[in-house]
């Protein structure tokens, strides 16, 4: 991509040529940015384990608190699914120590959130608190649910192995075993799903709808007429100041229903060469409008 010298905003005039390399492997890209030779200046989607292992005098890890969310989607579509019972879903939420998951599964690179929206963001409901850990109560409910073989199949990718191991350790305390299954299949009880809000101020349309709406890509439960009605009300409300109370109500509704295992908001990590000044965006989108070559480089 070449800089547009005719760009209308002189204060934000692009000044660098941008080359995207989607062929190079992640490991080679990290080695290249660490070398500082200018072949690679920014590596996106860096994992916590990669960030912890990254050492360089020529580059650094840049962290952004983007509008991301990681949840476990309960599979309510299975015949005789125990997750159709709201008490069982809530019990699973009470079985998890989220702070410990953040440390062991993400190396500390995440923010604790009660549901789907981060504190301070549009629609955040400050009346909500993350589900409190109560292993004793959770264990009683989950035992009574008679989950087949007392085993929870967790859909997770290899890059989520540390998180899976941390969840396994915690669920053992409430009498449950785990097994890791392909997240692309349907043979899961709980599937780990990462998503992000790329919108300016429309989290319900971009995030909540994907998990709970009738046309949601991640929905693994029967249609929820109550959620769809609340979403329709939001769509029929033109003024932003009138929308926010509705968003807060929707956030509380999905929290109470517990149709997902609420976890946290992962940080977005980049490996960035000292040659460039890089500004990450909180939408998670890779915007390079403010990226510049540092003088003297």
Show which residues each predicted segment covers.
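Periplasmic binding protein-like
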Residues: 33, 38-41, 45, 164, ...
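Bilobed "Venus flytrap"/periplasmic-binding protein-like clamshell domains
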Residues: 1-9, 135-141, 147, 153-166, ...
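Structural transition elements
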Residues: 94, 107, 111-144, 156-162
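Periplasmic-binding protein-like
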Residues: 79-120, 162-163, 254-259
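Short, well-ordered beta-strand elements
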Residues: 15-22, 148-157, 178-179, 192
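Extracellular/periplasmic solute-recognition and catalytic clefts
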Residues: 19-79, 182
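Short, solvent-exposed loop/beta-turn-alpha elements that line the ligand-binding surface or hinge
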Residues: 7-15, 53-65, 71-86, 122-137, ...
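Bilobed periplasmic-binding protein-like "clamshell/Venus-flytrap" ligand-binding domains
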Residues: 103, 141-161, 237-274
């Amino acid at each position: 991509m070449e800089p547009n010298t005719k760009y209308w905003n002189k204060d934000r005039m692009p000044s660098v040529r941008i080359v995207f390399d989607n062929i190079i492997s992640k490991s080679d890209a990290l080695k290249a940015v660490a070398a500082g030779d200018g072949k690679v200046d920014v590596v996106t989607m860096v994992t916590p384990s990669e960030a912890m292992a990254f050492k360089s005098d020529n580059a650094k890890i840049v962290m952004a608190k983007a509008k991301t969310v990681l949840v476990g989607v309960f599979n309510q579509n299975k015949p005789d699914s125990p997750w159709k019972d709201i008490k069982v879903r809530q019990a699973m939420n009470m079985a998890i120590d989220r702070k410990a998951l953040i440390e062991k599964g993400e190396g500390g690179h995440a923010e604790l959130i009660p549901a789907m929206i981060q504190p301070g963001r549009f629609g955040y409901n400050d009346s909500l608190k993350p589900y409190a850990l109560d292993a004793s109560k959770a264990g009683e409910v989950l035992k009574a649910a008679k989950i087949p073989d007392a085993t929870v199949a967790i859909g997770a990718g290899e890059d989520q192995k540390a998180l899976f191991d941390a969840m396994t350790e915690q669920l053992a305390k409430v009498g449950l075993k785990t097994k890791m299954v392909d997240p692309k299949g349907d043979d899961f009880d709980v599937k780990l799903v990462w998503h992000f809000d790329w919108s300016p101020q429309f989290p319900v349309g971009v995030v909540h709808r994907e998990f709970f709406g009738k046309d949601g890509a991640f929905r693994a439960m029967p249609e929820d007429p109550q959620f769809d009605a609340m979403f329709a009300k939001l769509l029929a409300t033109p003024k932003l100041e009138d929308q926010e109370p509705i968003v807060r109500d929707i956030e509380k509704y999905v929290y109470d229903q517990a149709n997902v295992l609420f976890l946290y908001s992962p940080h977005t990590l980049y490996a960035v060469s000292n040659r460039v000044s890089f500004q990450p965006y909180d939408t998670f989108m890779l915007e390079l409008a403010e990226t510049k070559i540092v003088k003297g480089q």
